[in-house]
UniProtKB/Swiss-Prot annotation:
Protein name per its UniProtKB record: Transcription elongation factor A protein-like 7
Naturally occurring in which organism (per UniProt): Homo sapiens (Human)
One GO cellular component term noted in the UniProt record for this chain: nucleoplasm
Similarity comment: family membership: Belongs to the TFS-II family. TFA subfamily.
Matches recorded under InterPro entries: TF_A-like/BEX
Region named Disordered: 1-34
UniProt keyword Transcription regulation present: yes
Function, as annotated: Plays a role in the negative regulation of NF-kappa-B signaling at the basal level by modulating transcriptional activity of NF-kappa-B on its target gene promoters. Associates with cyclin D1 promoter containing Myc E-box sequence and transcriptionally represses cyclin D1 expression. Regulates telomerase reverse transcriptase expression and telomerase activity in both ALT (alternative lengthening of telomeres)and telomerase-positive cell lines.
Comp. bias regions, Basic and acidic residues: 1-32
Tissue: Highly expressed in normal and fetal brain tissues, and weakly expressed in uterus and ovary. Down-regulated in epithelial ovarian, cervical, prostate, breast, brain and lung cancer cell lines and in brain and ovarian tumors.
Chain coiled-coil ranges: 60-88
Keywords linked to the UniProt accession: Coiled coil, Nucleus, Repressor, Transcription, Transcription regulation
Subcellular location, record wording: Nucleus
Length: 100
């Protein structure tokens, strides 16, 4: 058995930690949603500014970009055709009915 210290004689034996102030229920969640709301608001504001910048293009610039996009798509279609042709030629060359 432990002997009580002279320093601890006047104090209660078990020290109970003090409780923090009681917060209203849901305050933490409310603060978190406010923070998330602010972040989403700032992000949407930045996206809106970017959209506004794109809306100020002239019609000529938009049609030029559209033409460039169409040209790129045509190039992709042509490359796909070439790959299909090469693949089918390679496959047919292996399917010979007689050995070489």
């Amino acid at each position: 058995m432990q002997k009580p210290c002279k320093e601890n004689e006047g104090k209660p034996k078990c020290s109970v930690p003090k409780r923090e102030e009681k917060r209203p229920y849901g305050e933490f969640e409310r603060q978190q949603t406010e923070g998330n709301f602010r972040q989403r608001l700032l992000q949407s504001l930045e996206e809106f500014k970017e959209d506004i910048d794109y809306r100020h293009f002239k019609d000529e610039e938009m049609t030029r970009e559209g033409d460039e996009m169409e040209r790129c798509l045509e190039e992709i279609r042509g490359l796909r055709k070439k790959f299909r042709a090469l693949h089918s030629n390679h496959r047919h060359s292996r399917d010979r009915p007689y050995p070489i």
